[in-house]
Amino acid sequence: MKNLTIVADSNIASLDEFFNPIALGQNTEQQVQVIRVAGRDINAQLLADLQPDVLLIRSVTQIDQALLANNNSVKFVGSATIGTDHVDQDYLAERNITFANATGCSKHSVAQYVVSAILTLRPQYWAQSMTPLTLGIIGLGNIGSTLAQYASDLGWQVLGYDPLLATSDINNASLEQVLCQSDIVSLHVPLTDKKDTDTQGAMSISNNFSDYPTRHLINAETLARMSPHTMLINSARGPVIDAAALEADIDATERQVVLDVFEHEPQIAESLLSKLAIATPHIAGYTLEGKLRGTQIIYDALCEKLAVLPVLSMHQLLPLNTYLWSELKENPDRLLKFYDIKKDDTALRNKITSGQVKGSDFDQLRRDYHLRREWQA
């Protein structure tokens, strides 16, 4: 076997630990070269020049024919993310390129972020004597279903909507019911477009198509169905919400809105940011456990591709965690010790210059983010 060349997004956790000759089962005469590149700098010319065997990415890198047309060496693409809207999987299949993504890697991280945001803005919902909060969840995959479990633990009622799944205890409502009857609506859907979408002139078309498209799922019409008192949280994909419609809605209703993702990310307009109750730089999934789990999953998949047994587990790299959900949910005063979401909000707002947060500053906040811990369920 020839030496293995890997081009990797430099923001993927623990690259050195997982992607070295010993961890990948290579013999001592073979080398594993890991070339670290900022995710937005992985381009067609770079891949044509380097001709890597393996490409490890995050959601900021678009994988499609335009990127790989002049590369004939890549045999494996791994995305250390849950979402796949940045990857043209049909094209990879045509090229016989193996693809793996980190399904479920950050489900606890994101769900815990949402709970933290809710209880920071509406701490009264800690009280069991309160009328139970009704939490609407749109999208009941790995993250949405995990959030539903935490909500149940807190005694909250869940209204869930996912047209792609069978009816269940949590998939129990229509979109209309979720919008109209919830105290808080949290979005956990992939970014998808109509199957007949005309991509000509589209600013940012996804690589996913669906009978239930989610681009601008939250728009002027759907916002109008929601009570002004209903909080809206988006930690899924920015373009799921029409940003212009959202600004107009907040102006009219003073709605509490929490955004971790933005339609025109990585640039964020101050006009939107100033209206949000909480805004963070796409870090809902940024826990030590979530990041390591993402790396672990694509490492395991690459080992399978190379026909070697994985020899490293993320648990070998994790320090002791003292945050237990069983204790935290009974002691609300520990919430800020676990995660002060307002610090991340302040850090993002402090980057406003000339009426916006620049893309480079947004990316820097993500790159330099001090990974928090998940609480142990």
Swiss-Prot record:
<dbReference type="GO" id="GO:0051287">
    <property type="term" value="F:NAD binding"/>
</dbReference>
<feature type="active site">
    <location>
        <position position="265"/>
    </location>
</feature>
<feature type="binding site">
    <location>
        <position position="285"/>
    </location>
    <ligand>
        <name>NAD(+)</name>
    </ligand>
</feature>
<dbReference type="InterPro" id="IPR036291">
    <property type="entry name" value="NAD(P)-bd_dom_sf"/>
</dbReference>
<comment type="similarity">
    <text>Belongs to the D-isomer specific 2-hydroxyacid dehydrogenase family. PdxB subfamily.</text>
</comment>
<dbReference type="InterPro" id="IPR029752">
    <property type="entry name" value="D-isomer_DH_CS1"/>
</dbReference>
<feature type="active site">
    <location>
        <position position="237"/>
    </location>
</feature>
<feature type="binding site">
    <location>
        <position position="286"/>
    </location>
    <ligand>
        <name>substrate</name>
    </ligand>
</feature>
<dbReference type="InterPro" id="IPR024531">
    <property type="entry name" value="Erythronate-4-P_DHase_dimer"/>
</dbReference>
<comment type="subunit">
    <text>Homodimer.</text>
</comment>
<keyword id="KW-0664">Pyridoxine biosynthesis</keyword>
<dbReference type="InterPro" id="IPR020921">
    <property type="entry name" value="Erythronate-4-P_DHase"/>
</dbReference>
<keyword id="KW-0520">NAD</keyword>
<dbReference type="InterPro" id="IPR050418">
    <property type="entry name" value="D-iso_2-hydroxyacid_DH_PdxB"/>
</dbReference>
<protein>
    <recommendedName>
        <fullName>Erythronate-4-phosphate dehydrogenase</fullName>
        <ecNumber>1.1.1.290</ecNumber>
    </recommendedName>
</protein>
<dbReference type="InterPro" id="IPR006139">
    <property type="entry name" value="D-isomer_2_OHA_DH_cat_dom"/>
</dbReference>
<dbReference type="GO" id="GO:0008615">
    <property type="term" value="P:pyridoxine biosynthetic process"/>
</dbReference>
<dbReference type="InterPro" id="IPR006140">
    <property type="entry name" value="D-isomer_DH_NAD-bd"/>
</dbReference>
<dbReference type="GO" id="GO:0046983">
    <property type="term" value="F:protein dimerization activity"/>
</dbReference>
<dbReference type="GO" id="GO:0005737">
    <property type="term" value="C:cytoplasm"/>
</dbReference>
<dbReference type="InterPro" id="IPR038251">
    <property type="entry name" value="PdxB_dimer_sf"/>
</dbReference>
<comment type="function">
    <text>Catalyzes the oxidation of erythronate-4-phosphate to 3-hydroxy-2-oxo-4-phosphonooxybutanoate.</text>
</comment>
<dbReference type="GO" id="GO:0033711">
    <property type="term" value="F:4-phosphoerythronate dehydrogenase activity"/>
</dbReference>
<dbReference type="Pfam" id="PF02826">
    <property type="entry name" value="2-Hacid_dh_C"/>
</dbReference>
<feature type="binding site">
    <location>
        <position position="59"/>
    </location>
    <ligand>
        <name>substrate</name>
    </ligand>
</feature>
<feature type="binding site">
    <location>
        <position position="81"/>
    </location>
    <ligand>
        <name>substrate</name>
    </ligand>
</feature>
<feature type="active site" description="Proton donor">
    <location>
        <position position="282"/>
    </location>
</feature>
<keyword id="KW-0560">Oxidoreductase</keyword>
<keyword id="KW-0963">Cytoplasm</keyword>
<dbReference type="Pfam" id="PF11890">
    <property type="entry name" value="DUF3410"/>
</dbReference>
<feature type="binding site">
    <location>
        <position position="162"/>
    </location>
    <ligand>
        <name>NAD(+)</name>
    </ligand>
</feature>
<dbReference type="Pfam" id="PF00389">
    <property type="entry name" value="2-Hacid_dh"/>
</dbReference>
<comment type="pathway">
    <text>Cofactor biosynthesis; pyridoxine 5'-phosphate biosynthesis; pyridoxine 5'-phosphate from D-erythrose 4-phosphate: step 2/5.</text>
</comment>
<feature type="binding site">
    <location>
        <position position="260"/>
    </location>
    <ligand>
        <name>NAD(+)</name>
    </ligand>
</feature>
